């Protein structure tokens, strides 16, 4: 009887584990979200400089003000990454990669690897892919806590999180053999290493060895939304956007990227589709918040007439034509509308380009 009573009590006290997925600003699981960390100058006087952000997910109907600040573990990014820093993470697998890894990690900056930043966090049911533009982020699992790096406060940044079934991570693994990320922290053991051999390859600093030097795959989210990943290896030898993406999507593109680096590629109208460098971004609403591309480290692009929009980790400059990297695109109407509304100005093509 005592044993039965104990079992009943245990059943009453048992709480099922939270599903591993992206978590939104609402504190609830979401299929996907985008966080746009705003440049430091854009905050009001009574808010911390460089920590405010805009947010959207499948339920938000466009951009909203972020809940709290980007350095909070209660917001979408911090809450989604919490499982990484918990002590009971034995049933998880993860990869943290960044061409500019956190200074607390043993990895060094590397131009030999791809210009690519992201997080894979999963269990045997599924998890999420966080594609972002943030240097020195996130902290390694051993740090024990989510933090936002001080170096990433000044400029704008983008983070796209997509919740995915386990089956999709083999496809992501294939893509990472093209982008050739610098992995600075990982855990891929037993079941995960067996089922995801391409991720094991990536952890061992290996990459694709033969043509083609680019790859695209369809990814289906936990809720059935369709995303398309585009990945290129350094030997592709061309700009991601004008050399491949515009033609692959069959559309003109307006591209936001970091324009303070050397060798910036000008707007390109030499092909069937125009690829135009965005120079000014602005959010809708009474504040009329606008900022220059020189204040914005984010990487995204949008088809001016629809239906595509993409968030990734590559710039348009000469050096990155010879580095791996990629972007994740979708035709979700709300996603496209949100990014299309941001473009306020761009550089026209000069004659002959």
Curated annotation (Swiss-Prot):
Disulfide bonds join 22-161, 269-349, 310-329. Residues 1-19 form the signal peptide. It catalyses: Endonucleolytic cleavage to nucleoside 3'-phosphates and 3'-phosphooligonucleotide end-products. The active site is at 297. It is an enzyme of class 3 (hydrolase). Keywords: Apoptosis, Developmental protein, Disulfide bond, Endonuclease, Glycoprotein, Hydrolase, Lysosome, Nuclease, Signal. Its EC number is 3.1.22.1. Hydrolyzes DNA under acidic conditions with a preference for double-stranded DNA. Plays a major role in the clearance of nucleic acids generated through apoptosis, hence preventing autoinflammation. Necessary for proper fetal development and for definitive erythropoiesis in fetal liver and bone marrow, where it degrades nuclear DNA expelled from erythroid precursor cells. Belongs to the DNase II family. This is Deoxyribonuclease-2-alpha. It comes from Mus musculus.
């Amino acid at each position: 009887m005592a044993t039965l009573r104990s079992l009943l009590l245990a059943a009453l006290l048992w709480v099922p584990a939270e599903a591993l997925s992206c978590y939104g600003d609402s504190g609830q699981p979401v299929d996907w979200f985008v966080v746009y960390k705003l440049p430091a100058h854009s905050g009001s006087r009574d808010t911390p400089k460089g920590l405010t952000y805009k947010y959207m997910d499948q339920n938000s109907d466009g951009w909203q003000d972020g809940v709290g600040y980007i350095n909070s573990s209660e917001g979408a990014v911090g809450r989604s990454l919490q499982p990484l820093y918990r002590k009971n993470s034995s049933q998880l697998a993860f990869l943290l990669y960044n061409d500019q890894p956190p200074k607390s990690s043993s990895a060094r900056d590397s131009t030999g690897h791809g210009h690519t930043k992201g997080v894979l966090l999963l269990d045997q049911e599924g998890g999420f892919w966080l594609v972002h533009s943030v240097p020195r982020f996130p902290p390694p699992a051993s740090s024990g806590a989510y933090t936002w790096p001080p170096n990433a406060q000044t400029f704008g940044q983008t983070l796209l999180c997509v919740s995915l079934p386990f089956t999709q991570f083999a496809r992501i693994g294939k893509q990472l053999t093209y982008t050739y990320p610098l992995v600075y922290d990982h855990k891929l053991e037993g079941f995960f290493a067996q089922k995801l051999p391409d991720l094991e390859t990536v952890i061992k600093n290996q990459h694709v060895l033969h043509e083609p030097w680019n790859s695209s795959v369809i990814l289906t989210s936990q809720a059935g939304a369709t995303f398309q990943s585009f990945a290129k290896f350094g030997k592709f030898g061309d700009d991601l956007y004008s050399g491949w993406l515009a033609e692959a999507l069959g559309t003109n593109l307006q591209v936001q990227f970091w324009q303070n680096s050397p060798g910036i590629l000008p707007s390109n109208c030499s092909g069937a589709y125009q690829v135009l460098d965005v120079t000014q971004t602005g959010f809708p609403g009474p504040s009329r918040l606008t900022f220059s591309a020189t204040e914005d480290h984010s990487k995204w692009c949008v088809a001016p007439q629809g239906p595509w929009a993409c968030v990734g980790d590559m710039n348009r400059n000469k050096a990155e034509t010879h580095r791996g990297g990629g972007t994740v695109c979708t035709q979700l109407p709300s996603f496209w509308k949100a990014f299309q509304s941001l473009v306020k100005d761009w550089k026209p093509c000069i004659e002959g380009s």
